[in-house]
Protein backbone atom coordinates (compact mmCIF):
# COMPACT_ATOMS: atom_id res chain seq x y z
CA UNK A 1 0.00 0.00 0.00
CA UNK A 2 1.14 3.51 -0.71
CA UNK A 3 0.96 6.26 1.92
CA UNK A 4 1.52 9.98 1.61
CA UNK A 5 3.00 11.61 4.70
CA UNK A 6 2.77 15.40 4.94
CA UNK A 7 4.64 17.47 7.50
CA UNK A 8 3.31 20.74 8.90
CA UNK A 9 5.25 23.08 11.14
CA UNK A 10 3.43 24.63 14.10
CA UNK A 11 6.36 26.68 15.39
CA UNK A 12 10.09 26.68 14.95
CA UNK A 13 13.08 28.58 16.24
CA UNK A 14 14.47 31.26 13.94
CA UNK A 15 17.08 30.43 11.36
CA UNK A 16 17.65 27.38 9.21
CA UNK A 17 17.37 23.81 10.51
CA UNK A 18 20.48 22.57 12.35
CA UNK A 19 23.05 20.77 10.18
CA UNK A 20 22.92 17.64 12.36
CA UNK A 21 19.15 17.44 11.81
CA UNK A 22 19.57 17.66 8.05
CA UNK A 23 22.25 14.95 8.17
CA UNK A 24 20.01 12.68 10.26
CA UNK A 25 17.09 13.26 7.86
CA UNK A 26 19.31 12.29 4.92
CA UNK A 27 20.39 9.09 6.71
CA UNK A 28 16.78 8.18 7.55
CA UNK A 29 15.77 8.81 3.93
CA UNK A 30 18.62 6.63 2.70
CA UNK A 31 17.60 3.84 5.07
CA UNK A 32 13.95 4.06 3.95
CA UNK A 33 14.99 4.06 0.28
CA UNK A 34 17.31 1.06 0.76
CA UNK A 35 14.48 -0.96 2.32
CA UNK A 36 12.25 -0.06 -0.65
CA UNK A 37 9.79 1.81 1.57
CA UNK A 38 10.54 5.36 0.39
CA UNK A 39 9.37 6.14 -3.14
CA UNK A 40 9.79 9.94 -3.09
CA UNK A 41 10.31 12.85 -0.71
CA UNK A 42 10.84 16.57 -0.97
CA UNK A 43 10.60 19.83 0.87
CA UNK A 44 7.84 22.22 -0.19
CA UNK A 45 8.17 25.91 -1.00
CA UNK A 46 6.16 28.29 1.22
CA UNK A 47 2.47 28.69 0.42
CA UNK A 48 3.28 32.25 -0.71
CA UNK A 49 4.63 30.61 -3.88
CA UNK A 50 1.52 28.46 -4.40
CA UNK A 51 -2.12 28.75 -5.36
CA UNK A 52 -5.40 27.25 -4.18
CA UNK A 53 -8.15 26.26 -6.63
CA UNK A 54 -11.68 25.95 -5.26
CA UNK A 55 -15.04 24.91 -6.71
CA UNK A 56 -17.98 26.40 -4.85
CA UNK A 57 -21.46 27.29 -6.04
CA UNK A 58 -20.55 26.09 -9.53
CA UNK A 59 -17.67 28.59 -9.79
CA UNK A 60 -13.97 27.87 -10.04
CA UNK A 61 -11.81 30.28 -8.04
CA UNK A 62 -8.02 30.51 -7.99
CA UNK A 63 -6.36 32.21 -5.02
CA UNK A 64 -2.64 32.91 -4.89
CA UNK A 65 -0.83 32.18 -1.62
CA UNK A 66 0.08 32.74 1.09
CA UNK A 67 -2.75 31.03 2.91
CA UNK A 68 -4.03 31.97 6.35
CA UNK A 69 -3.51 28.56 8.02
CA UNK A 70 -1.29 28.74 11.07
CA UNK A 71 0.46 25.48 10.10
CA UNK A 72 2.57 25.65 6.94
CA UNK A 73 3.04 22.36 5.04
CA UNK A 74 6.80 22.03 4.58
CA UNK A 75 7.49 18.56 3.16
CA UNK A 76 6.09 15.25 2.07
CA UNK A 77 7.20 11.65 1.69
CA UNK A 78 5.65 8.84 -0.33
CA UNK A 79 6.02 5.33 1.10
CA UNK A 80 5.22 1.84 -0.21
CA UNK A 81 4.66 -0.34 2.88
CA UNK A 82 2.58 -3.32 4.00
CA UNK A 83 0.55 -1.56 6.70
CA UNK A 84 -0.53 1.84 7.98
CA UNK A 85 1.48 1.11 11.12
CA UNK A 86 4.68 0.90 9.05
CA UNK A 87 3.95 4.29 7.48
CA UNK A 88 3.23 5.74 10.93
CA UNK A 89 6.55 4.34 12.18
CA UNK A 90 8.53 6.05 9.39
CA UNK A 91 6.70 9.34 10.02
CA UNK A 92 7.27 9.02 13.78
CA UNK A 93 10.98 8.47 13.29
CA UNK A 94 11.12 11.61 11.13
CA UNK A 95 9.33 13.69 13.77
CA UNK A 96 11.52 12.27 16.56
CA UNK A 97 14.57 13.60 14.71
CA UNK A 98 13.03 17.07 14.78
CA UNK A 99 12.15 16.75 18.46
CA UNK A 100 15.60 15.52 19.43
CA UNK A 101 17.78 17.69 17.18
CA UNK A 102 15.89 20.99 16.90
CA UNK A 103 14.83 22.15 20.39
CA UNK A 104 11.72 24.30 20.28
CA UNK A 105 10.50 22.92 16.94
CA UNK A 106 6.86 21.79 16.94
CA UNK A 107 4.98 20.15 14.11
CA UNK A 108 2.73 17.34 13.00
CA UNK A 109 2.54 14.71 10.29
CA UNK A 110 -0.48 13.27 8.51
CA UNK A 111 -0.37 9.72 7.14
CA UNK A 112 -2.84 9.18 4.29
CA UNK A 113 -3.34 6.00 2.25
CA UNK A 114 -3.38 6.51 -1.51
CA UNK A 115 -5.95 4.82 -3.72
CA UNK A 116 -5.21 3.45 -7.17
CA UNK A 117 -7.41 2.35 -10.07
CA UNK A 118 -7.66 -1.16 -8.59
CA UNK A 119 -9.34 0.24 -5.49
CA UNK A 120 -12.31 1.32 -7.60
CA UNK A 121 -12.67 -1.74 -9.82
CA UNK A 122 -16.12 -3.33 -9.93
CA UNK A 123 -16.43 -6.57 -7.93
CA UNK A 124 -15.71 -9.71 -9.92
Ranges and model annotations:
Residues 1-124:
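Conserved, structured core segments of small domains
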Amino acid sequence: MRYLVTLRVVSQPGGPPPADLMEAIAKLGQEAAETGALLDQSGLAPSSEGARIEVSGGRLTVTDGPFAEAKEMISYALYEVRTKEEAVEWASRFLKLHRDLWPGWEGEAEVLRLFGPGDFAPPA
